[in-house]
């Protein structure tokens, strides 16, 4: 019986996900430990036009926000669809995971995940073209994330010329 009660009272929103930062400096155990104590969230699927003020307005509803770091294209130095939100307390971050993860911001469903802690340099996209890796391969047109994916944009002019003959 107690096993069933534990399952009912578990809070999957604040559990640590399977995702791990592949660039983390340290071993898996250290990363797990930091994630379980973290006050920092990675927030993805933001519009390229979402402002720091919009992020602050939403995420401050769950607790006192220490700082927000907007993700930047490492080449253009423009927003590229993600950010880090640091809270003063773990409780504030847990509330955001419970109540804000999966909600809409700037007409997009955002996703939040635990982060082991922001380190300088992580604000830049890791894609080959400077933005996020996921935007490199996207085939659909998404005006809030810069149109077509970077690789699709490179092939579009050739396809357009081929289709005119």
UniProtKB/Swiss-Prot annotation:
Q: What is the species of this protein?
A: Siniperca chuatsi
The protein's name in its UniProt record = Nuclear cap-binding protein subunit 2
> Does the keyword field hold Cytoplasm?
yes
What GO cellular-component annotations does this UniProt entry give? Answer: cytoplasm; nuclear cap binding complex; nucleus
Q: Which GO terms describe its molecular function?
A: mRNA binding; RNA 7-methylguanosine cap binding; snRNA binding
The residue ranges of the RRM domain are: 39-117
Which InterPro entries does the record match to this protein?
NCBP2, NCBP2_RRM, Nucleotide-bd_a/b_plait_sf, RBD_domain_sf, RRM_dom
Q: Which family does it belong to?
A: Belongs to the RRM NCBP2 family.
Keywords in UniProt for this one?
Answer: Cytoplasm, mRNA processing, mRNA splicing, mRNA transport, Nonsense-mediated mRNA decay, Nucleus, RNA-binding, RNA-mediated gene silencing, Translation regulation, Transport
């Amino acid at each position: 019986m107690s096993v069933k009660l534990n399952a009912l009272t578990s809070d999957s929103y604040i559990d640590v996900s399977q995702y791990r930062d592949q660039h983390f400096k340290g071993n898996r155990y250290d990363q797990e430990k930091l994630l379980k104590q973290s006050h920092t969230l990675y927030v993805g699927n933001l519009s390229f036009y979402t402002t720091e003020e919009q992020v602050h307005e939403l995420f401050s509803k769950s607790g006192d926000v220490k700082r927000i770091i907007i993700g930047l294209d490492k080449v253009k130095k423009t927003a590229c669809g993600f950010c880090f939100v640091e809270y003063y307390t773990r409780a504030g971050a847990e509330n955001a995971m419970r109540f804000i993860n999966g909600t809409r911001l700037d007409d997009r469903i955002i996703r939040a995940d635990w982060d082991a802690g922001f380190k300088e340099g992580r604000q830049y996209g890791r894609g080959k073209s400077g933005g996020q890796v996921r935007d490199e391969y996207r085939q659909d047109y998404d005006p809030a994330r810069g149109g077509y994916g970077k690789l699709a944009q490179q092939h579009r002019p050739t396809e357009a010329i081929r289709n005119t003959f």
